[in-house]
C-alpha cells in the first residue's frame, strides 16, 4: 500500500528569548492511502503542532515531510498554500463557515482559489453536499442550520476539492453526543468511499472510530497501534 504521508526524523522547535523549545523531537510516521488514523495526546504532547505541519499550516525545523510525492519540508508559504489547497481538506471544531453565504456557496469557497468557474463550483458543491446528505439545504445559511448540519457543510467543503487527505481537528468538540455519533458515522462512510482520514482528538470515544491510533507524549510517538475494536457505522 502506498504512503500518502511520510515523516522522517521530523522536529519542530519554537524560539523564545533566543532559546529553542523543542515540541516535536524526531517523529517517524507513515500513513498509507485510505487509512483512517486518530492522533491523540494530552495537552503539550505536540499533537496540535503535528497537525499544523501535516496540514501545511506550519513547517518543521528539521526532518522530512513527504506529502503524496511532494517534499513539503522546505517549501515557502506560497508553495505550501498551493499544496494545501489541492491535497488537504480541513474540518475544524469551530466550523468556520461564512454566515452571509449559503451552504453551497460555503462549500464552493476552496474552488474560488483554484480558479474554477462559478457554474462548475456550484455543481461540484452540490455533489459534495449530496455526499453528506444536505443537498436539500444547499440554499440555507448557517443560522438556518443545526450544529450537526453546519458541521456536515464543513465536511462537504473539505471534500469539494477531492483532496488526498481529510484532516479533522476535534470535529465533534462543539456537538452534543447524539450529533457527534452522526458526524463520526459520516466520517466512516467517507473513509469507506476511499478517502484517507486523519482525526485529531483527545476523546477516547471519538478515537475508537479510527482503525489506527497514534499517541503522542512529550513530542514523541508513544504508541502506534491498530484498533481492532473500531466502531462500525
Describe the residue ranges of each PLM region:
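ABC-family P-loop ATPase nucleotide-binding domain
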Residues: 1-13, 223-233
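ABC family nucleotide-binding domain
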Residues: 3-216
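H-loop (His-switch) and adjacent beta-strand-loop-beta switch element
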Residues: 213-225
